[in-house]
């Protein structure tokens, strides 16, 4: 949702997935929402929008993003990374046939893949600005 992360993330994803366009499904603190799954209405809304992206737009991958100074998830980096990892696990249950990655946008607005992103897959771009 935060405009400060949109362009760096879109640029990263265009390069990472070798695509011209990126669908954006935005919520404040999506990593925490999908990790905790306590707000079923919002989780369902996110999944409905991701379904459109994957099924109708034939998206090549899904990225879940956390970032520095997030108002929707004011947790520290370590906890947000844990939320990202849990969110990835949750999304992989719904989308097992598509690549799902977690990204952390730091205080300098650099996009970084989180550790353990692609178990068994080669790391494409560790950092992008």
Role assignments for model-derived ranges:
Residues 1-9, 28-42, 52-61, 72-129:
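Divalent-metal-activated hydrolytic enzyme cores
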Residues 10-17:
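Short Gly/aromatic-enriched secondary-structure transition segments
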Residues 20-30:
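A short beta-strand-loop structural module common to alpha/beta enzyme folds
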Residues 61-67:
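Acidic beta-strand-to-loop metal/phosphate-binding motif
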């Amino acid at each position: 949702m935060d405009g400060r992360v949109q362009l760096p993330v879109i640029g990263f994803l265009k390069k990472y997935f070798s695509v011209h366009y990126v669908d954006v499904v935005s919520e404040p603190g999506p990593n925490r929402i999908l990790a905790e799954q306590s707000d079923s209405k919002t989780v369902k809304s996110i999944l409905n929008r991701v379904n459109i992206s994957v099924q109708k737009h034939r998206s090549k991958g899904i990225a879940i993003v956390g970032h520095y100074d997030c108002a929707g998830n004011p947790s520290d980096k370590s906890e947000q990374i844990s939320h990202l990892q849990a969110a990835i696990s949750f999304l992989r249950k719904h989308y097992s046939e598509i690549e799902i990655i977690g990204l952390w946008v730091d205080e300098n607005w650099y996009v970084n893949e989180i550790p353990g992103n692609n178990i068994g897959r080669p790391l494409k771009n560790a950092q992008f600005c």
